[in-house]
Structures are given as structure tokens and as C-alpha cells.
């Protein structure tokens, strides 16, 4: 067991006071949790395998602060370890464009993933543990432990009240993730006051039922020996994740300790001074770090971590010699590169090919891609036969003892846990090694995972949502399952690809974009109903996010659509010309995000000035204002019935589109029209 002495106590006091000083400097933040949690953080990081000079070393231990509001503690710890934080960075805590934002963000040194909304961090940690287990099972060889790292997380009462943590903790227990160790900061205080007002369950019994190893430390404010002993015991558990309940005092040492008042406000000046006196620091000085604390962390954490990194590098060089194929593949993944020519395996389609639901063309794409992309790891939230996310011959990611699969398997059975699936995918992506996670559910149920979807965009995790049954076209399941507002919501999220392909070629383009994406997640919305392979659909043009799929000279109107409505718009355009000699251009706009990043010249060549533009999409119209003068869509809930009959009910037919196109032309006749894309700034 690790030994602790006065230098450890000094290090903990330094952590506490640096955290308090940050909050004091900003006059904003959360001093309570750092004061109580500092001993836990010290114990974790004292044994953490990391290298601040190579923070992305693949075999490092991961640490996730799920209760991200206590990030002043994390920044203090990372500064002491020599990560790229100066004292001035700590002084700039919570200031605009600082490197120390109010909750941990991935762009800050040493921060594995953006956390803050409670419950997300522990769920991301489950994803990291899954990735590590898969990575180890794929690449480890006898005598060559390429991956044997742990994932550590700190969570609070609030994290464990959030539903997403229940989803992911349940799955982690089922998957027997012995590489996951979580510390539960039980301080009995919430923003409202005592947690007993709303939360009195036996958390450890719940986690025991999930299949976790459970432990308890009663005196977390200062009993580093017991914390360390529990951690070492947790490492012995190879077939269960571990949760260690540590009873702490929020705001330990403060005049307000043990109260809700110390949670989220700066301490008063006299309180800060008495804290510093209590722990032997000058009460009139701030951001003080004794040199012996820097030296201690360098000796106990930094130098051993550098040595382990160097030993790993030497081992990897030998590995590449002994296992050249695996070594080459692994080096490529560590470089963040894709296999040369991988895109040639994307299926191409012609108008002579059978009409297929885009969920089926998606299945063809995924089946081809998993053969050439070992970093592609997928699953579904208990909708595999509907999402068509599993390929023939797939091996499930399961504990080998269950005989249901193994840890080298790349198909994850998430169960009915959409939010958990999203947060886990974020963690898999954040693990590194170029992992490309995808997860399937109905488009409408992506809303269950809104928190994780938003954090994927904020944290820059390029995960892929395979979102089938993308409209009223799903039919009989009715309005509870039919998405209306969902795409508008997703399109409103910054840094988010939202693809709705019209046929097979556009589906291939959507996946090409999603797989190539560096720091932008993707939602691929796919139809349940069959759609024709369109005559002028283009993989290359679709990669621009929008293009002219049916053109005429001097159009009287432009119809712009996505997905299943593109073919209807083309039929409407032909009908308009055959019956009224009205000339209609049709534009397919499968991804707004990509289209918006094309040159102004290209965008205005597709949707120019001087022509009325009408959008047609059988979902909410609210996201179409910047592309169309008029929108035809569905701003009410759908109906239960056969898909084609529901389309007819709302007049979503070629005749219905043609009629509204004619009305749009007449309305704007004689008026000077600028493209809706035109903007002053």
C-alpha cells in the first residue's frame, strides 16, 4: 500500500488552496467540492499513469471529472503535474477565452473530454473503458501489453441521480469492465440543501445489483491511506467495474463547511484567510505553491510516467518488428489516418438498381466499411433488426465468459439506452486510436440522447448516429415514433453534420463525410420506406452538402428537398412541365452544415437570386428559412397508419408539391427576389 507523509498533506493543502484562489479570483465557481475532494484527487493522480509531456500517449490512464463544476481542483492538479497551465492561467479561471473555463473542455491540456452536465462524465468513462478493452483484445500479444490502462472517474451525488449514469453503469456491470474505477464523492449536499430532501437510496446496493464491486471510505477528508487501499483493491477486480463511495465534507475547512452555501459561490475573504492559516500558508498571499510540492509530483508521477512512456515506445518498436501487419495498422491508427483507398469500398448505385430504403443502403455501406476500417465500432439501442446496423459475421463486444462474444468484438448491444449509448460513443471517440463509433436508433429517439449529442458537438467527438425511421413514412407506429421537430433541433446545434440522404449514392456520401470528419459528429437520417436510385444523384456532388439534381434552363421555381422528398420533388417538377410548361429546378440538400461551408459562388449557383425557392420536407419547416422563400412541411404531429396513406393525408405527393409550387410562383410574380441565403453579415 502507498505510504503517505507530511509532503502528501502539504500537496493536498496546496490543491485545496489553489482551487479556492481560482474561485476567489473569478468571484465565481464552486469551492466546496474541491475542498472535500482534494485527498481523492491526490491519491488518484499519485498513481496515475500519465506523461504531461506526451499527454495523448495511448497507454495512459484516463481521468474524467464527471462533476465538472469542481474543475478548479482538476486545473490545480494538472498545473502541479506540469501540464500546460501557468499560474496566470489559474488566475484567469472562468474568464473569456481562458484556458481554464468554468467546466472542463477538451481543448484544455490534460482534459480527456468536455464534461459538466451531470452524469455525462461517468458515462463517457464507460465508453473509454469499452474502447480500452477492445483495443487491448485487438492488439495485445503475449509479452506485448500494448494497452493495459485504467479509466478513473470522480462523480457526485448529482451524477448518480441523472438517468444517463444509470443506463451506462448498468451496461458497464453487464460488460464486466474491470478497467473502470469510479470514486463517488458523497457529501450529502445539493444546491437545494441536503440530498436527503430528494435522494436517500442506498447507492452501493444499486451498483452491487448492476454487477459492480463496491467499497466505502468513511473519512474522505483526510484518510488518504484508506482511499489508496480501496484503489489498490479495485485494481485487483478484473471482471467488475468498481465504485468507491468516499464520504467527504463539502467545503472542508471552510466556515461554511457541510452547507449548500459553500457549493457554488466564492468564499468570503475572512474565510479564505482562516483556511490558509489553518494549513500553514500566508493568509495574505494567493496562488502559492511550495517548491517541494512541484518536486514531489515530478518525482512520484511525472518522471515515472515518462519512463513508462519510453518503455512502451521501445516495446512498440519491437512489436512492429515481430507483428508487422498489426504494427503497421496500429501505427496508422495512432497517426489518425485511414487506410489508403478505403473509400473505394463505398457502394455506388445506378438508376437501374432496385429501390431501397436508405436504412438498407446504410447497411450495405456499413458492411463494406467494417471490412476495411478496424476502428469502426458500432451498435444499436435494441433496434438492430430495424436499424440494420449489424453486418453478417459480426462478433459482439461481450465478456468472453458469457460466450456471447468477446472484447475484440465490434458490435455493442446497448439495450434500450439511447442516452447512455450517445455518452458511451463520446467516450469511445475520446479514447483515441482513431475509433469511429456509430450507434443506431430511430431518429425520434435521438432526442432521448440530446445531452450527449450536444456534448459530442461541443467536445469535438466525431461519432455517428444511424437514425432510421426518419419521418411519417415509418407508418403505423404513429406520432409517438414519427419525428417532426427532431431534425430542426439537430440542425440548430453548432458543429453538427445532419445528413438526410435521398438514395444510395447520397448515403455513401454521408458516411464518407462522417468517417472522414475530424472533430464534427454526424447524424445520418434514414428512411424506412423504399426510395428509388435517382438518375442524377452524385456521390461527389453530395459531398458539397447540396447540389442540383434535376435542372432546366431559366427555371420558374426551385424545389429544394432532402431524403425521401427529393424523388417526389423530381416527379412534381416533371408534372409541372408536362401539364403547365412550368420549369422547375430540383435541389437535393442532404446536409445543411456542409452546404453552408461551400463557397458563396457555389451556394448561389445552386440557389440563385431571382427565382422563387420552395422547400419540401415532411418534417418541421423551422430550419428552412435561410434557403427557401416558402416551405411545405409538417408543423404538427403525424398519424398512425400506412406510410403512403399518411403522405396522402397531408398532400405530400407530386400533385401536392406541384400545386404549392404554382402558388409560390404566382405569389412572387413581379416581385424582386433575392436568394434567402443573402446576408448583410
UniProtKB/Swiss-Prot annotation:
Catalytic reactions on record: D-sedoheptulose 7-phosphate + D-glyceraldehyde 3-phosphate = aldehydo-D-ribose 5-phosphate + D-xylulose 5-phosphate
Catalytic machinery residues: 418 (proton donor)
UniProt keyword Transmembrane helix present: no
Entry's Gene Ontology BP terms: pentose-phosphate shunt
Positions that bind thiamine diphosphate: 69, 116-118, 158, 187, 263, 418, 445
Keywords associated with the record: Calcium, Magnesium, Metal-binding, Thiamine pyrophosphate, Transferase
GO MF term set: metal ion binding; transketolase activity
Cofactor(s) this protein requires: Mg(2+); Ca(2+); Mn(2+); Co(2+)
Family designation: Belongs to the transketolase family.
Protein name per the record: Transketolase 2
Organism: Saccharomyces cerevisiae (strain ATCC 204508 / S288c) (Baker's yeast)
Amino acid at each position: 500500500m502507498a505510504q503517505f507523509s507530511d509532503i502528501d498533506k502539504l500537496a493536498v493543502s496546496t490543491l485545496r488552496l489553489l482551487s479556492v484562489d481560482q474561485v476567489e479570483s473569478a468571484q465565481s465557481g464552486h469551492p466546496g467540492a474541491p475542498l472535500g475532494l482534494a485527498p481523492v484527487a491526490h491519491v488518484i493522480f499519485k498513481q496515475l499513469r500519465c506523461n504531461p509531456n506526451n499527454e495523448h500517449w495511448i497507454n495512459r490512464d484516463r481521468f474524467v471529472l464527471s462533476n465538472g463544476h469542481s474543475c478548479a481542483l482538476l486545473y490545480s492538479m494538472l498545473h502541479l503535474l506540469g501540464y500546460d497551465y501557468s499560474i496566470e492561467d489559474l488566475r484567469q479561471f472562468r474568464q473569456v477565452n481562458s484556458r481554464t473555463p468554468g467546466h472542463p473542455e477538451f481543448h484544455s491540456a490534460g482534459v480527456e473530454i468536455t464534461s459538466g452536465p451531470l452524469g455525462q462524465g461517468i458515462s463517457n468513462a464507460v465508453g473509454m473503458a469499452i474502447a480500452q478493452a477492445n483495443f487491448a483484445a485487438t492488439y495485445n500479444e503475449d509479452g506485448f501489453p500494448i494497452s493495459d490502462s485504467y479509466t478513473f472517474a470522480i462523480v457526485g451525488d448529482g451524477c448518480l441521480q441523472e438517468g444517463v449514469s444509470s443506463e451506462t453503469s448498468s451496461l458497464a456491470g453487464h460488460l464486466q469492465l474491470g478497467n473502470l474505477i469510479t470514486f463517488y464523492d458523497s457529501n450529502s449536499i445539493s444546491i437545494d440543501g441536503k440530498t436527503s430532501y430528494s435522494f436517500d437510496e442506498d447507492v452501493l446496493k444499486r451498483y452491487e445489483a448492476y454487477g459492480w464491486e463496491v467499497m466505502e471510505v468513511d473519512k474522505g477528508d483526510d484518510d488518504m491511506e484508506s482511499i489508496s487501499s480501496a484503489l489498490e483493491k479495485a485494481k485487483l477486480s478484473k471482471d467488475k467495474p468498481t465504485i468507491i463511495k468516499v464520504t467527504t465534507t463539502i467545503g472542508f475547512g471552510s466556515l461554511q463547511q457541510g452547507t449548500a452555501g459553500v457549493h457554488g459561490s466564492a468564499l468570503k475573504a475572512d474565510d479564505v484567510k482562516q483556511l490558509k492559516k489553518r494549513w500553514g500558508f500566508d493568509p495574505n498571499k494567493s496562488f502559492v505553491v511550495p517548491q517541494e510540492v512541484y518536486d514531489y509530483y515530478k518525482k512520484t508521477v511525472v518522471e515515472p510516467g515518462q519512463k513508462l512512456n519510453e518503455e512502451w515506445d521501445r516495446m512498440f518498436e519491437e512489436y512492429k518488428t515481430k507483428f508487422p501487419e498489426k504494427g503497421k495498422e496500429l501505427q496508422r491508427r495512432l497517426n489518425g489516418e485511414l487506410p489508403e483507398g478505403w473509400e473505394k469500398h463505398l457502394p455506388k448505385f445506378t438508376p437501374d438498381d432496385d429501390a431501397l430504403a436508405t436504412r438498407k443502403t446504410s447497411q450495405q455501406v456499413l458492411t463494406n466499411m467494417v471490412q476495411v476500417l478496424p476502428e469502426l465500432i458500432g451498435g444499436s439501442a435494441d433496434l438492430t433488426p430495424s436499424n440494420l446496423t449489424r453486418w453478417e459475421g459480426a462478433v459482439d463486444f461481450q465478456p468472453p465468459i458469457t460466450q456471447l462474444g468477446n472484447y475484440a468484438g465490434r458490435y455493442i448491444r446497448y439495450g434500450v439506452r439511447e442516452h447512455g449509448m450517445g455518452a458511451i460513443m463520446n467516450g469511445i471517440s475520446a479514447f483515441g486510436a482513431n475509433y469511429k463509433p456509430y450507434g443506431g436508433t430511430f431518429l425520434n429517439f435521438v432526442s432521448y440522447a440530446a445531452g450527449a449529442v450536444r456534448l459530442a458537438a461541443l467536445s469535438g467527438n466525431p461519432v455517428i448516429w444511424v437514425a432510421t425511421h426518419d419521418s411519417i413514412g415509418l407508418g403505423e407506429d404513429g406520432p409517438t415514433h414519427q419525428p417532426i421537430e427532431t431534425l430542426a433541433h439537430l440542425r440548430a446545434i453548432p458543429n453538427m453534420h445532419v445528413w438526410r440522404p435521398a438514395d444510395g449514392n447520397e448515403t455513401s456520401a454521408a458516411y464518407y463525410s462522417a468517417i472522414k470528419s475530424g472533430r464534427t459528429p454526424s447524424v445520418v437520417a434514414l428512411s424506412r420506406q423504399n426510395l428509388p436510385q435517382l438518375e442524377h444523384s452524385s456521390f461527389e456532388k453530395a459531398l458539397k452538402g447540396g447540389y442540383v439534381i434535376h435542372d432546366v434552363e431559366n427555371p420558374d421555381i426551385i424545389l429544394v428537398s432532402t431524403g425521401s422528398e427529393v424523388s417526389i420533388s423530381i416527379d412534381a417538377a416533371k408534372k409541372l412541365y408536362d401539364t403547365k410548361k412550368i420549369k422547375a429546378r430540383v435541389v437535393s440538400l442532404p446536409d445543411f452544415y456542409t452546404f453552408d461551408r461551400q463557397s458563396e459562388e457555389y451556394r448561389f449557383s445552386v440557389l440563385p437570386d431571382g427565382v422563387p425557392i420552395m422547400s419540401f420536407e415532411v418534417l418541421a419547416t423551422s430550419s428552412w428559412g435561410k434557403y427557401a422563400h416558402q416551405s411545405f412541411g409538417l408543423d404538427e404531429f403525424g398519424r398512425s397508419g400506412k406510410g403512403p396513406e399518411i403522405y396522402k393525408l397531408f398532400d405530400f405527393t407530386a400533385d401536392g408539391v406541384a400545386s404549392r409550387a404554382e402558388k409560390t410562383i404566382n405569389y412572387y410574380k413581379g416581385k424582386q427576389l433575392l436568394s434567402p441565403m443573402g446576408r448583410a453579415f
